[in-house]
Amino acid sequence: MARRPDLQSGPERLAALVRSSIPPMHSAGLPFVGASLAVALLGRKRRWMRRAGLISAGANAAFFRHPPRVPPTRPGVVVAPADGLICLLGEATPPAELGLPDIPMQRVSIFLSVLDAHVQRAPIGGEVVAVRHRPGRFHSAELEAASEDNERNSVVIRTPEGLHIIAVQIAGLIARRIVCDVHVGDKLSIGDTYGLIRYGSRLDTYFPADARVLVSHGQRTLAGETVLAELA
C-alpha cells in the first residue's frame, strides 16, 4: 500500500504552507509576469535592469493575485464583487445600455486601488442575462461622474426568484483594460470569478430598492465575502 504523505513535517508540509500563504495568480497576469522575468533574464548582466525586471514581476504577481474566498451560504444576500473601499452609497438608475426600466435601484460603489486584488466575483448566484460594454473616458474612478462618463462593462444576473442584480466594471485613471469572462446564458454561483480590471478601477453593484443595505461609506470589502445587502 502506498504511504500517505506526512503533512505534519517535511517537504509536503512546507509546500502546503507556501500554497496557503501565497495566493494563486489570475491567468491574465501571466503575460505581464513573464515579460518582466524576460527583462530580468536578458538584463542579468546589468544589475539595475535585472532588479527592475524582478521588481516588476513581483508587483504584477501581487496585482493579479487571486486569493481564495468563502462566500456566505445563507440565501438572499448580495456580496461585494470586488476588494476595495466603499466610496458611494445611494439610489441610481442602472446603465442605459442595458435597456432596463428607468427605475432607481440601490447602488454600492467600491473603489479599487492598485494595491487591492483586482479579480471580480459574482455578487449573487443566477443566470447571466445581459453583458454590455460601453466605451468611455478614463477619469478617476473615485468620482461619482465615473459611473456615467468612464468606460464600463455591465453584467446582469437574474436570480432564481427573478430579481436582477447588476455588476458594473468601471475603468479608471490608470485602469485601461476591462476583462469579462462571462457570456449570456452562463450560470454563476455566488462568489464565482468572472473578470478583472487592470491597475485601479471601480465596481458598481445595483440591486432592488427594497433591499436592506448592510454596509457603510468608507468600509473595506472583500470580494465574494462581504455582504452588501439582504434582498427583501
From Swiss-Prot:
It holds the Pfam family PS_Dcarbxylase. Heterodimer of a large membrane-associated beta subunit and a small pyruvoyl-containing alpha subunit. Belongs to the phosphatidylserine decarboxylase family. PSD-A subfamily. Keywords: Cell membrane, Decarboxylase, Lipid biosynthesis, Lipid metabolism, Lyase, Membrane, Phospholipid biosynthesis, Phospholipid metabolism, Pyruvate, Zymogen. InterPro entries: PS_Dcarbxylase, PSD-A. The modification Pyruvic acid (Ser) is found at residue 201. The keyword Cell membrane applies. Its main location: membrane. The gene is psd. The record marks 200-201 as: Cleavage (non-hydrolytic). One of its GO terms (molecular function) is phosphatidylserine decarboxylase activity. Signal peptide: none annotated. Pathway: Phospholipid metabolism; phosphatidylethanolamine biosynthesis; phosphatidylethanolamine from CDP-diacylglycerol: step 2/2. The active site is at 201 (schiff-base intermediate with substrate). This is Phosphatidylserine decarboxylase proenzyme. It is a peripheral membrane protein. Its cofactor is pyruvate.
